[in-house]
Amino acid sequence: MTFREKMPTSPKSPLRRRRSSWTGTWLNHQTTSFKQAVSAVIQAQSPRSRFKSLSSDFSDVDRTLSLSDSLLLKILEKLPESQNEDVSLVCKRWLSVQGRRLRSMKVFDWEFLLSGRLVSRFPKLTSVDLVNACFNPSSNSGILLCHTSISFHVSTDSSLNLNFVEESLLDNEMVDKGLRVLGRGSFDLIKLVVINATELGLLSLAEDCSDLQELELHKCSDNLLRGIAACENLRGLRLVGSVDGLYSSSVSDIGLTILAQGCKRLVKLELSGCEGSFDGIKAIGQCCEVLEELSICDHRMDDGWIAALSYFESLKTLLISSCRKIDSSPGPGKLLGSCPALESLQLRRCCLNDKEGMRALFKVCDGVTKVNIQDCWGLDDDSFSLAKAFRRVRFLSLEGCSILTTSGLESVILHWEELESMRVVSCKNIKDSEISAALSSLFSLLKELTWRPDTRSHLSSSLEGTGIGKRGSKFFKKR
């Protein structure tokens, strides 16, 4: 029997079955209807389908390459700040473009600056803080020393040496070298914070960064201020001389006079831990004619400096903070002038038990409209009574004045005819029960009143009826 004779002739045989077509596949499928089959055929023959097949071949192509860096930068600027780190991880180009967005930087690694990576990675920086990077890092140390804007690691042996902070600082030449590197690459620099720099470093920076407007100099000295005249466009300046427990430096009348003659366009000035006297403050007032804000922190000035404040013709805000004394011997009251444009007087964390200094200060600032006294000790009724010298107070804020009483407050504010707003917080000797009818009548005329003198009584009244703050006998009964 031949092979042909053995072939089965039954139509149901699998060898005689016709090859299935695409129509049979669609039509014979149990879950596919005829309408779905027709729709699939039409979609397969459409140009859009052919376009999809072509575009799928370019799925791995970076389409942002067709965008210029400036256009890509504008797009990335629309993203929220929370996505900045994610954007930098996309590719090297996005990392570079993202670096141009950053405007402010606090540097912790000095080698990152010296190597040039800071200015190449972030070419558009306008604000740079180098203070923390100016300290030699202590290896294998878990002790972190923090003081306001300064923080660095110290070794366990530092407690045996009282000058460990100054010894941890980079030397002057190294700091000046970093300023030269920064100046050559950061032409848009507007603000700089640095410590332990010298006159030469400041001069080199001023030559390259002509737009520098704000400068903060820690461990400042008279010699350093000799190079400040090169910063012609300086508008804001903060000088930190000595800081108790960290480092010591001297800014005397010599430095203040150099500052006054070299920075005549100053609008904002802060003197922290600086020395000086009447002559230095007077020079600033006479030369810096557009100065509007003066801050004096932890001053070490000689007596009589307050009288020089009358030479500031454009001063609008005076802030005195963290001072152990105001002025022990301000001189005769007849010789004290006043600041004609002064609007706001702020006293924070100061010792105000110096009656003569307070009397002189309030007389010089007699034209202020805003008075803010916060967390000051020594402000009793007698000291606060000197505030009657103010003639045009519209806003008063008292916070943390624990010695001042209700009668002491009342005796002063009833003399202020223009008072519109008042804020009294955490002054425990000012009692609600001691408010007189005259004081209550004054409160009703104020436009704004924040009255929380005794926070403990305020908390008790707010929790009344809630059951909170009572003894636990209700919940811990003996069974």
Swiss-Prot record:
Organism domain of life: Eukaryota
The species this protein was found in: Arabidopsis thaliana (Mouse-ear cress)
InterPro entries in UniProt: F-box-like_dom_sf (IPR036047), LRR_dom_sf (IPR032675)
Annotated region described as Disordered, given as residue ranges: 1-20
Residue span, F-box domain: 62-108
Stored PANTHER family: F-BOX DOMAIN-CONTAINING PROTEIN, PARTNER OF PAIRED, ISOFORM B-RELATED
Signal peptide limits: none
Name this polypeptide is given: F-box protein At5g51380
